[in-house]
Amino acid sequence: MTQITFKNNPIKLSGSEVNEGDIAPNFTVLDNSLNQITLDDYKNKKKLISVIPSIDTGVCDSQTRKFNEEASAEDGVVLTISVDLPFAQKRWCASSGLDNVITLSDHKDLSFGRNYGLVMDELRLLARSVFVLNENNKVVYKEIVSEGTNYPDFEAALKAYRNI
């Protein structure tokens, strides 16, 4: 079980750990229109999965913007996953000024968080993290940010994404 800190408080993450070299497990989340989405919906595309605790915080907002601005022109897809309600994600997307933002909600049953070992049970939030998957869903990059209020290593994640 991985342990991080969130606002300097120790938090254990629950769920199944996923590592570089693994085939990423499938998951079910909701899009902004309450449609069920799975990893299989992005078959044969490289993926940058940006995981945030909540879209309504400054760090999460910045992380979502940065990855979408830097990686959306690449031949692949950038997915931002949080436990925010789809309605909150839809509101954020409408006000963000960004095109092509894909936000997905793991609020319903934490399928993504549990399958990737990212659930902060005490807070019912997901740990800030980044996964890069190739077209065959092999994990080629993984970062779980050790302090949940800090930024991920944007450059390392983007380099891994671009090098697929």
From Swiss-Prot:
InterPro entries given in the database record: Redoxin (IPR013740), Thioredoxin-like_sf (IPR036249), Thioredoxin_domain (IPR013766), TPX (IPR002065), Tpx_CS (IPR018219), Tpx_Peroxidase_subfamily (IPR050455)
EC class of the enzyme, as a word: oxidoreductase
Keywords: Antioxidant, Disulfide bond, Oxidoreductase, Peroxidase, Redox-active center
Catalytic activity, EC: 1.11.1.24
Pfam families recorded: Redoxin
Domain of life according to the entry: Bacteria
A GO molecular function held by the record: thioredoxin peroxidase activity
NCBIfam families for this protein: PRK00522.1 (NF001808)
Family according to the record: Belongs to the peroxiredoxin family. Tpx subfamily.
Miscellaneous notes: The active site is a conserved redox-active cysteine residue, the peroxidatic cysteine (C(P)), which makes the nucleophilic attack on the peroxide substrate. The peroxide oxidizes the C(P)-SH to cysteine sulfenic acid (C(P)-SOH), which then reacts with another cysteine residue, the resolving cysteine (C(R)), to form a disulfide bridge. The disulfide is subsequently reduced by an appropriate electron donor to complete the catalytic cycle. In this atypical 2-Cys peroxiredoxin, C(R) is present in the same subunit to form an intramolecular disulfide.
Described function: Thiol-specific peroxidase that catalyzes the reduction of hydrogen peroxide and organic hydroperoxides to water and alcohols, respectively. Plays a role in cell protection against oxidative stress by detoxifying peroxides.
SUBUNIT field: Homodimer.
Protein name as annotated: Thiol peroxidase
Organism: Staphylococcus epidermidis (strain ATCC 35984 / DSM 28319 / BCRC 17069 / CCUG 31568 / BM 3577 / RP62A)
Gene coding for it: tpx
